[in-house]
């Protein structure tokens, strides 16, 4: 019902990949509307099957030439340039030791402060190593369209530009290998992870339609009597993002699906964060 099989579509593939948001279809239709890469010349229409092709097709994040990415199959972003699967060990900063991290952050820990600070620094570097691989900025005037069994696995798409369309794509949320402990998060502290499937960070005129967002499988782990959270949100809309329409999407098997605004103190968000949600299934 939610993903669009082209063999059953009344319009051809060429028409579908260039489809724009209809007038009056929510806040993303305001002003100039949302057209994504509909005006792309044929040389800027890309068939994408892996991470390297995806990044190459997007090009420079400041490039505003319209472009369309047609996604085929599963693209795993926890992979290197040769397609090799990357794991925790590949991202881990030298000197990071999870047991030392636990011991130095445990309630009433007697570990030296220097060890705690060292492991804090190592986990931040490890997170940055993973971030470099999975966080991808989408330039303005881009359409990302799923064509055949399209799935983006473990990516954090950052939308900080204007005029982006994402349709017919399944997202498996990023798996943060290095959750960090915050003793002040709630009465008992909490484990916090980074990365969302889509982060609309100041982006404007964004249309996300007929997509499916969910977590992958993961072990259930508990430390300090709190779940060791490997996954953050599915879609975050923050930092003066505006004129967003999300339609006919599925949000499944996740407890932090959509965040709209991330601080009451951000006065710059006043008048922004205009979002339309319709026909989504949670």
Regions found by a protein language model. Give the residues of each.
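Bacterial N-terminal signal peptides
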Residues: 1-5
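Boundary at the C-terminal end of the N-terminal hydrophobic targeting segment
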Residues: 9-14
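Acidic Gly/Asp/Thr-rich repetitive segments characteristic of extracellular carbohydrate-active
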Residues: 23-70
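Acidic glycine-/aspartate-rich tracts in secreted/extracellular proteins
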Residues: 52, 74-77
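Extracellular beta-strand-rich solenoid/capping regions of secreted or surface-exposed proteins
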Residues: 56-65, 78-143, 151-168, 173-204
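Active-site-proximal loop/turn and secondary-structure-junction residues that shape catalytic pockets
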Residues: 75, 257, 262-264
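Short consensus segments that form the blades of beta-propeller domains
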Residues: 133, 187-189, 224-227, 266-271
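Right-handed parallel beta-helix
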Residues: 140-141, 145-148, 162-175, 196, ...
């Amino acid at each position: 019902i939610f993903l669009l099989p082209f063999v059953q579509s009344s319009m051809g593939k060429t028409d579908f990949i260039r489809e724009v948001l209809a007038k009056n279809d929510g806040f993303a239709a305001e002003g100039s509307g949302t057209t994504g890469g509909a005006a792309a010349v044929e040389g800027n229409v890309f068939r994408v099957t892996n991470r390297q092709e995806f990044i190459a097709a997007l090009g420079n994040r400041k490039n505003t030439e319209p472009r369309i990415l047609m996604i085929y199959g599963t693209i795993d972003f926890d992979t290197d340039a040769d397609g090799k699967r990357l794991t925790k060990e590949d991202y881990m900063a030298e000197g990071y030791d999870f047991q030392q991290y636990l011991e130095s952050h445990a309630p009433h820990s007697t570990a030296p402060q220097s060890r705690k600070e060292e492991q804090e620094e190592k986990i931040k570097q490890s997170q940055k190593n993973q971030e470099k691989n999975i966080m991808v900025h989408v330039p303005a005037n881009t359409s990302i369209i799923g064509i055949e069994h399209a799935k983006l696995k473990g990516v954090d798409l950052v939308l900080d530009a204007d005029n982006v369309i994402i349709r017919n794509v399944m997202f498996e949320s990023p798996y943060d290998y290095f959750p960090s402990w915050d003793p002040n998060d709630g009465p008992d502290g909490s484990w916090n992870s980074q990365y969302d499937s889509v982060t609309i960070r100041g982006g404007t005129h964004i249309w996300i339609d007929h997509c499916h967002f969910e977590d992958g499988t993961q072990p259930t782990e508990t430390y300090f009597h709190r779940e060791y959270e490997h996954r953050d949100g599915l879609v975050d809309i923050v930092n003066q993002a505006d004129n967003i329409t999300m339609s006919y999407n599925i949000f499944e098997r996740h407890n932090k699906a959509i965040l709209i605004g991330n601080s009451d103190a951000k006065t710059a968000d006043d008048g922004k964060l205009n979002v339309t949600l319709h026909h989504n299934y949670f």
